[in-house]
Amino acid sequence: MCGIVLPSIQQQSSHGDTRILKVVVNGGVPIELGASDSANFSFSITAEDPSGIRSVDQIGLWSNNYGILVPSATSCQAVSRTTSVCTGTSSVSIPKHQIFDDMAGHWFVQATANANDGDKRTEDEAGKFSVLKMSRLTVFGGPTQTVARGQSISISGLLEKPDWRTQTMVGNPSQNVSLQFCANGCAKPVTVATVRSDSGGNLLATVRASSSGTYTWVYPGSFWASSVSSFPTPVTVGS
């Protein structure tokens, strides 16, 4: 059975020793959407009862701000006498207006597991997953010529996020972004500056050039936006 189920109106009628053990959506990784993307994804629900699992139904994929996605019916496969894994699919489309800006972030899976002996377990938050805005980060402004050791250089950049209403990319303001430096041959970059994006998503850091290498902007993401790194920009330091 499939359909749209709202936690606020779903009858809570669990009884017996049926349990929902695990829920995995999109292979356990966030669903990331750009300005006008659509995505198909799968989900699996593992349930257990001493008598075995007959079905998992009443699936609801929901978020705050009335976010709802429509799931398929599930298909269950017994992995032991007591436990079954039930799988299904769903999709989300920005052009079809299935998700809006205030729905980015945390989502939940509601499900009812039905046992062979008539027991069942219903959970509004049987599992959780994330639908994120796909960030974009561009580096600008590195010096194009050789600079002297110890010279101050400025590296600029732009952090953007999708606006799902207009289906365009816009600046992402008030976000902490790190500038990392990797000297030629380095095994691990080091953070040389952390700045906050301005109202238009613009970034600017001034550092002293110590050796030749590359500078990269790194955004750690948030609960509603994906992490992202810019392409590295090279800087050559003379003797």
Located regions from the model:
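Short amphipathic beta-strand segments in non-cytosolic proteins
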Residues: 176-194
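Extracellular acidic, Ser/Thr/Pro-rich low-complexity tracts
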Residues: 34-55, 60-66, 115-117, 161
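Glycine-centered loop-to-beta-strand initiation motif
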Residues: 84-88, 191-207, 213
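Enriched for extracellular/lumenal, surface-exposed ectodomains of secreted and cell-surface proteins
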Residues: 106-121, 211-233
